[in-house]
Amino acid sequence: MGFHIYEIKARQIIDSRGNPTVEADVILEDGTLGRAAVPSGASTGTNEAVELRDGDKSVYMGKGVLKAVENIINIISPELEGMSALNQVEIDRKMLELDGTPNKSKLGTNAILAVSMATARAAAEHLGLKVYQYLGTYKANILPTPMCNIINGGAHSDNSVDFQEFMIMPIGAKTFSDAIRMSAEVFHTLKSILSKKGYATSVGDEGGFAPNLKSNEEACEVIMEAIKSAGYTPGTDIAIALDPATSELYDPKTKKYVFKWSTKEELTSQEMVEYWAKWVEKYPIISIEDGMAEEDWDGWKKLTDKIGNKIQLVGDDLFVTNTSFLKKGIEMKVANAILIKVNQIGTLTETFEAVEMAKKAGYTAIVSHRSGETEDTTIADLVVALGTGQIKTGSLSRTDRIAKYNQLLRIEEELGSIAEYHGKDVFYSINK
């Protein structure tokens, strides 16, 4: 026995941007400890679950999380003590019941998620299993094709690039470790190219470079140059993935997309769709996330109709890992993929439900980090457990990003000959 929850502890720690975040310890009767820390985002969807912040401007500029910590200690812990850590669904449902709001604004998604993940870690430890084995089925053996962020723009940097993330995907790699090697080689090659062009090679929140490029196109051009210079073929060995985060560019009053960091150009929804269609013809782009704004459902529909059969179109701000929004998207035939961010929804149970719904509808799913991360590696285990085949967890720099890749390398080693890496085949929503 000994698998019942004895006590839950919580504390305020610091994330990769120097902001406070929540860490929880779930301690079982036999002394087993499960620990988890939650991330936070810079560009957030308006429908995301609420991250509870203290709001006291004199402490951490109002970003303290002591209220969330107190909620774990004073409200969640007494209610969960004595419950079986092996029943993740029951634990998560109990916390949702305790919160009682549609967006987790009472207890805070940062409090609920920390306990949800720590419970899974404690249960896995108690059973002598790895987290991916515990959360996954008997066939949790697919290593993800990574989306590696190598150039940052928009809200993630201070340059003249409108789009938030330019990423590479090693779709031609044979194994996950090969994929990481290829990505690292392109990352280092890009650094040399930027340096020779006189650009800064400091990195942004997610470890990608944030050079003051002259245009959005130049970002794609230097990435293409880096892929070729590293000895790879763009589109065959390594493809480009984008997260323009266009909700940040959209003006709901004029219903136009404003390229506020570069040309100040304003585009209608239809013009934005045509813009992406041209880019997909010009560059080896395999995936675009948030290509249209979260409130521009008509624009999303037009984009999906235009290029949804050619590339992966990922809803992040659009779906916020929430089954009700995903259901709407599926019914409207909008997008063909969902980004999975555990802290957008707040529990592991709801995360699994969202992935299940996506898979049933033929939508792909990508497990993702946030721009404010910690050393916690739960999402690395989660992506293998869920078998989504894709992960987005930053660049090949910064320990908060590398921690996830290193955990996946360990998992690949543990799986040995049964480890699978699907490369381009993960795009089942377009490989029909």
Swiss-Prot record:
Signal peptide: none annotated. PROSITE patterns: ENOLASE. The active site is at 206 (proton donor), 341 (proton acceptor). It holds the Pfam family Enolase_N. GO terms for cellular component: cell surface; extracellular region; phosphopyruvate hydratase complex. It catalyses: (2R)-2-phosphoglycerate = phosphoenolpyruvate + H2O. CDD domains: enolase. GO terms for biological process: glycolytic process. Gene3D superfamilies: Enolase-like C-terminal domain, Enolase-like, N-terminal domain. Binds a second Mg(2+) ion via substrate during catalysis. One of its GO terms (molecular function) is magnesium ion binding. Mg(2+) binds at residues 243, 289, 316. Keywords: Cytoplasm, Glycolysis, Lyase, Magnesium, Metal-binding, Secreted. The keyword Nucleus does not apply. Pathway: Carbohydrate degradation; glycolysis; pyruvate from D-glyceraldehyde 3-phosphate: step 4/5. It is found in: Cytoplasm; Secreted; Cell surface. Belongs to the enolase family. This is Enolase. It comes from Borrelia recurrentis (strain A1). The gene is eno.
